[in-house]
């Protein structure tokens, strides 16, 4: 019995090794799980479910095979792929979740999320996030021709990279009080998230008791997952 969590694969055609590693993961470890949760940034960018990128179809088919094998797959949007919609969800068999979800895993209450909303010190990013999550702005963007959406997405990624290069690492990390607030709001002692690309298990205090925050690593030179069993919560790195 095990439930698996992954995040921040940033899949793109320019990184075939990561894609190959993910496909092997889906054909192996994922098939043995009780469930698979993808906590955002599965893709480096997402400009709409109507994008005919062959990579997207390849990944949808691979995830659907896992679902068809009896392993439910769930998805929380990240800051890179927040426009993943119901069309792709149907193609892949994934179930789209809210940005914060509380799970009961073998008697252990766990809060899961992508993690970007915990970075409350980065006010510039939060303002941008609020803007691009505005429903009418999303509808307007998705109504644009694909080639224009590609250009806008490329410019946004370039601007984000430039902005992040001038920010301190502390600003781009989670705010400790935001973490405690989220855990106390959901009455949990465990939190699993991604986004920061700083894999670790942090011990803290929440709800007047010891609590733990488990941060998933990004898939760069190796894979990263959290494996929850009835007996343990493990942060695991593995080769592609």
Curated annotation (Swiss-Prot):
Question: Where is this chain's protein located in or outside the cell?
Answer: Cell inner membrane
Q: What would be one Pfam family of this protein? A: Metallophos
Membrane topology designation: Peripheral membrane protein
Keyword presence, Metal-binding: yes
Catalytic activity, reaction form: UDP-2-N,3-O-bis[(3R)-3-hydroxytetradecanoyl]-alpha-D-glucosamine + H2O = 2-N,3-O-bis[(3R)-3-hydroxytetradecanoyl]-alpha-D-glucosaminyl 1-phosphate + UMP + 2 H(+)
EC top class, in one word? hydrolase
Residues that hold Mn(2+) 2 according to the record = 41, 79, 114, 195
Question: Which residues of the sequence carry a binding annotation for substrate?
Answer: 79-80, 122, 160, 164, 167, 195
Cofactor notes: Binds 2 Mn(2+) ions per subunit in a binuclear metal center.
Q: Known NCBIfam families for this protein?
A: lipid_A_lpxH, PRK05340.1
Family designation: Belongs to the LpxH family.
Q: Which PANTHER family match?
A: UDP-2,3-DIACYLGLUCOSAMINE HYDROLASE, UDP-2,3-DIACYLGLUCOSAMINE HYDROLASE-RELATED
From the Swiss-Prot or TrEMBL record, give the protein name.
UDP-2,3-diacylglucosamine hydrolase
State the species of origin.
Klebsiella pneumoniae subsp. pneumoniae (strain ATCC 700721 / MGH 78578)
Gene encoding the protein: lpxH
